[in-house]
A protein has these predicted regions:
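Feature responds to low-complexity, polar/acidic, surface-exposed segments characteristic
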Residues: 2-30, 43-59, 66-92, 99-120, ...
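A short amphipathic alpha-helical interaction element
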Residues: 33-36, 65, 97, 126, ...
């Protein structure tokens, strides 16, 4: 799920719904990839690749979220983060997400450009976005059933509990329950999550 809006990415150059590396309808991410691609949420690169196993960075995630939200980014012309160039491909998206309270930085002055986003951070950002959009986030799953419950950061537990209940997150292992909160999100996983998120918006 990495490589979102790479500098080399060419939007709408390739035929719609056609990625050379997403061709098997039996793959768990197949429908989600084409769902998101058809709506302009996540694009491929100039080689016609979606890169389903690619890692997603923090700035790539907020760019996708902005697309999902249909955000008007034209008014976001400045940012407090010293590692974000407002005229970059992600600058206004980061400013939008931060200004509206969806995402914070990794420190007071740094957003964390180039850092991969993990599952608990993704859940937290979506949770904040959902709250501010008036989506009911009151129903939450019992996270103590997961073997790595103790590894979930305290600041993300409510968000993760909501995300699990909403079907956005689940166990990363089919043999036992493990939430893997620190695991980096892939492009394929992001496509699946955003397709599911659309159903509860």
């Amino acid at each position: 799920m990495c490589g979102e809006l790479l500098d080399t990415e060419i939007i709408n150059k390739l035929p719609k719904n056609e990625f050379y590396d997403v061709i098997n309808p039996e793959d768990w991410y197949y429908n989600a990839v084409y769902y998101c691609a058809s709506r302009g949420y996540i694009q491929g690169n100039e080689k016609g690749q979606f890169m389903p196993d690619g890692k997603l960075t923090r700035e790539q995630f907020v760019v996708i979220l902005g697309r999902v939200a249909g955000a008007d980014l034209s008014q976001y012309t400045e940012t407090k983060f010293t590692d974000v160039k407002i005229n970059s491909w992600y600058g206004s998206s980061v400013a939008w997400a931060n200004k509206n309270g969806y995402v914070n930085g990794i420190s007071k002055c740094k957003f964390g450009v180039g850092k991969n986003i993990d599952r608990e951070s993704l859940a937290t950002i979506l949770y904040r976005y959902a709250q501010k959009q008036g989506i009911d986030v009151s129903s939450k799953a019992d996270l103590t059933v997961y073997s790595d419950y103790a590894k979930i950061s305290s600041w993300s537990k409510d968000a993760c509990a909501w995300a699990v209940n909403a079907g956005l997150l689940g166990s990363t292992n089919t043999n036992y329950l493990i939430l893997s909160p620190k695991m980096t999100v892939t492009r394929a996983q992001a496509a699946k999550i955003f397709m599911s998120f659309d159903s509860i918006k």
